[in-house]
Amino acid sequence: MKRIGFIYGLLFCLVLSVAAQEKVVKLKIVETSDVHGNYYPYNFITRHEWKGSLARIYSFVQKEREQYKENLILLDNGDILQGQPTAYYYNYIDTVSPHLCSEMMNFMKYDAGNMGNHDVETGRAVFDRWIATCDFPVLGANIIDTSTGKPHLAPYKVLERDGVKIVVLGMITPAIPAWLSENLWKGLRFDDMEETARKWMRIIREKENPDLVIGLFHAGQEAFKMSGKYNENASLNVAKNVPGFDIVLMGHDHARECKKVMNVAGDSVLIIDPASNGIVLSNVDVTLKLKDGKVQSKDIKGELTETEAYGISEDFMKRFAPQYETVQKFVSKKIGTFTESISTHPAFFGPSAFIDLIHTLQLDITGADISFAAPLSFDAEIKKGDVLSLIHISEPT
C-alpha cells in the first residue's frame, strides 16, 4: 500500500515538473498611426464631433488592459504632430508648456513611438522638444546623424513581457528629401529601409536573441521610387525580403490593410495598417507556447478595430480638459473679415479670388518674385464674415 502511494506521489511530482516547464503567454499589440493631431473626439476645424481620436483609442486600451495588464503593448507609428490646431498650438504657439502630445501619450503609457514625415516637417526645434518629453523611446533606425554616422534616435526597443523578449525596430520612409526643405531636418539623412532592416536584424539576432520581432515602419506597402531614388513605401519589401520579422506595423499611406505574407525564408509575416486619424487601430493577438523558457510555437492574428464603438475615455477627457479649452479659445480668435465669400471652384476654369489671396500672401510673407499655388480642393470655400484662427490646419507636405 505504501509502495502504491509512493508511485502516485512520484507521478504527481512529475506532472507538476512538466507543467512548470511549459507555459502559454498571450500578448496584445495595439498600433496607432497617422493620428494627425486628432487627440480629442472633436474636429476643431469643422467644429463637429470626430469619429477617431486618442480619447477613443484610450477607451479601447483601458478595456483591454483589464485583461492583458502589462502584456498589452501600445505603439505609435508616426505622423502625430500635424493635422489639427491641437498639434499646431503646442508646436508653435505655446512652446513653454509640456507638449500636449507627449503628455497624452505618457498618460496612455505608450511603450514606443516612431517618427513620421509630418513629424519631421514640424522642424527639429519642435520634434526634438517633443521627443525629449516622451517617457518612451521614439524610434528611427534609418534616421542618421550626419556628424556621427549613427542613428539620431534609438533604432529599436527591447520589451520583456512574462518571460518573452520582444524587439520593436522603428523606421521612417526615406523620401523626406523629396518633400521637405533641408532646414527642417538639417544634420540628418534618411537611409533605405530594406538595407537598414538587414543591418539591424543581424544585430538584433546576435545581441538580443528575441522571441518576437515587430517592425514599426512609417511607410506603406506599395513600393515605388520618389524622385528616382527614394523607395517611399517599402514595408512590404522589408517584410518579404528581410527574414526575422513576425509582424510589420505599417503607416503613412492612410490605407487600411491586414494580411499575412510569406517571406523569402518561407515564414509567415503579418502586415497591418490602421490608416489615419485614429478611426481604426491595429489590434494584434499573439499566443506563444514556451517550454523550458524557449518558444515552441507562435500564433499571430490581426484585425482592424473601429474605435468609435468603444466610446470616449472620461479619464482622458477630464485629465486634458484645460488644454482642450485653451485650444478652443485659440481657434475662436478673430483674425480678419471677408466682405464676400470666395471659393476654389472658379480656379479650375479661370481667375479665382481664392487663389489670388494665396498668391498675395505667399509673395508678401516670403518676399518671393514668383508664386505657385494649386486649389487642391474642388469646392473649398471661405464664407463672407469673420475669419477665425482655426484656419491653421496643417503644414501639408
Language-model-detected regions and their locations in the chain:
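Ser/Thr-centric signal marking residues that sit
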Residues: T32, T366, T397
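Residue-level detector of conserved catalytic or cofactor/ligand-binding positions
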Residues: I391-T397
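Bacterial Sec-dependent N-terminal signal peptides
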Residues: M1-K23
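Short, compositionally biased low-complexity segments
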Residues: I29-H36, T173-A175, E325-T337, S389-L390
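Residues marking helix boundaries in flexible regions
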Residues: G5-Y8, K28, H392
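Acidic, metal/ion-coordinating pockets
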Residues: Q21-T307, F349-I355, H359-L361
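A short C-terminal boundary segment appended to hydrolase-like catalytic domains
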Residues: T287-V387
